[in-house]
Structure formats: structure tokens, C-alpha cells
Amino acid sequence: KPYHRTPPEAVKSVVSGDGSGTAWNVKFIFAILFILMFSKQVYISSLTNFLTFYVMEKFHVDPVTAQYALFAFLGAGAAGTLLGGPITDRFGRRKVIFGSIFGAAPFALLVPYVGFWGVIALVILVSFVISSAFSAILVCALDVAPRHTGMVSGVFFGLTFGLGGAAAAFFGWLADIIGIENVFLAASFMPLAGIFALALPKKL
């Protein structure tokens, strides 16, 4: 069954109450979406900026091979973002957000413990899966605040780049202190925040 944009009447019922005494506050929904976006972007940023250095340091590969690994990671992310829309239409936003972020956690947690080719396979899988959540998160935010689509789009696209830049600076500072391998280990826990997607209303 095709999954269409939530009609305004349904959105109103989601944010004001579903008739059973459960009220979903707009600020609460946005807070959950921000947490999900934060965890997603921080993890992606950590891999984007440090994957090449990680595989060079841990597996002693040459820079060209390390760049191929980064290319594969970014390519999988682009594919995930592109296909995230149709996947969301098919399965629904809440399921896709939860499955994309929290579902990527087991693979992300394995990355620091496998060999070179295992790392490549896992980061490709994680990149594709976690990137597919972006369109679902954005559409959820737009439906919650249908009269402020421009502002919401700007905020979430701004978060995409802003959080990525801030995370890159933070992880760079942290890598100088504890090392790149430990940074990867710390970042691998970020997708666990996808569990917060279960707090989103089922009607959204």
C-alpha cells in the first residue's frame, strides 16, 4: 500500500491528541527528530573525516586504497539518501527512521573489531542504511509544522551541514587525545540513539 503524505487533519490529531488521552506535543516531536538527526550526522561525519586515516593507521594501507574506501562509503550514503524516499513510501516514516538509525547500530559497533575488508563491507552497509533516514526525518518535520515548511527545511538542512562540521572539529580534537581508533569506537555507539524513534507517534 503506497505511503502518502500525512493529510493536515491527521497531523492535527497527531500533535493535539488521538482521542485516547495521548497528546503529542510538537516540541517533543521536534526534539526527538533533532536527537535522531544529531546521532546520524555525528556518526556519518566521523567516518567521512577519519575513515581514510583509520584504515591507514590500523591496516597500514596506502593513501590511494584508503581513498577508495572513503569513495565506497560516500557512494553508499548517496544511494541510501536517494532510495530512502521510495523505501519510506513503502514502509512508513517511523519504521524507516527506527530501522535506518537503530538498525545500523549492530554493524557500526562491529567496525572497530573486524579486518580491512570487513570494515569496507560494514561501512558501506552502515552508510546506505543510516543515510536512508534523512528523507523520512525531513518529511516528518514538515508534516508536524506544515505552515513553516521553509523554516523547517532550512533548519534540518542546516543541521545536516552544521552538525557535520561541529562533529568533525570535535572528533579531530578528540583524536589528538585518545587516537583515531578510540574515536571510531566512541562514534560507533551513536546509532543506538535510533531507539528514540520509538517515541514518535505511530500516526506520524
Model-predicted regions and their roles:
Residues 1-20:
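Flexible cytoplasmic inter-helical loops of multi-pass small-molecule transporters
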Residues 78, 102-106, 188-195:
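Small-residue-rich packing faces within the transmembrane alpha-helices of Major Facilitator Superfamily
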Residues 80-92, 175-176:
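Helix-to-loop junctions at the C-terminal end of transmembrane segments
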Residues 86-137:
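C-terminal transmembrane helical hairpin of 12-TM major facilitator-type secondary transporters
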Residues 145-180, 184-187:
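A late C-terminal transmembrane helix in Major Facilitator Superfamily
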